Amino acid sequence: MQIQDQQKVIDWKDHEFDGLYDEEYRRHSLIHWTPIEVTKKVLEWLNVTRGTHVLDIGSGIGKFCSFGAIYTDGQFTGVENRLDLIEVANSINKKLNIKNAEYVHSNITEIDFRNYDAFYYYNPFCEYLSISDSIDDSISYSPEKHREYEDSVIEKFQDLPINTKVVTYCSEKFAFPDTYELKDLLFKDKLALWIKTK
């Protein structure tokens, strides 16, 4: 079934949007998928307009990118290392007739951040540290892998131009380079806006 009226989707609550997904994915919403209210604030902070290209680091089933693509005229790319989650995300694109969101099946270490204007980071490597809250059993406990991926992202953030914006969610322990300044906090300090200043 394809939903033609995207304007209606903009007004949906989380339970309505989550209803697009099968139960096996829907049950992870509270922990792993970005709430719509949070997504709207992220898009505002990143000032997403036509021509803005946003990278979602660890996009999962694509809820952030899909809603963002409907809510704004920006271009969204989600990178995800699990092919089955990308297939789910693409199925939602088809249902909602979304043309400005895409998903890349890749390891984050292989992504060139310089191809993007703004970034969203929702604790994408947490499953390497907390298996009990995992989406599936494809990821094994590995603090070393968690550190490797975070270090790769930090290094890539360092190479971006001044005024680059990054929004993090539930990522309070992420060690931003000192070239970035914290500019704002919301949602009990779980949502943070960082801007590269030097």
Predicted regions and their residues:
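Conserved class I S-adenosyl-L-methionine
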Residues: 51-60
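Conserved SAM-binding loop of SAM-dependent methyltransferases across substrates and taxa
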Residues: 63-73
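Conserved SAM-binding motif I beta-strand of class I
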Residues: 75-80
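Conserved SAM-binding strand-loop segment of SAM-dependent methyltransferases
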Residues: 97-106
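Short conserved loop adjoining the S-adenosyl-L-methionine
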Residues: 110-114
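C-terminal substrate-binding/active-site "lid" region of AdoMet-derived donor-dependent transferases
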Residues: 128-196
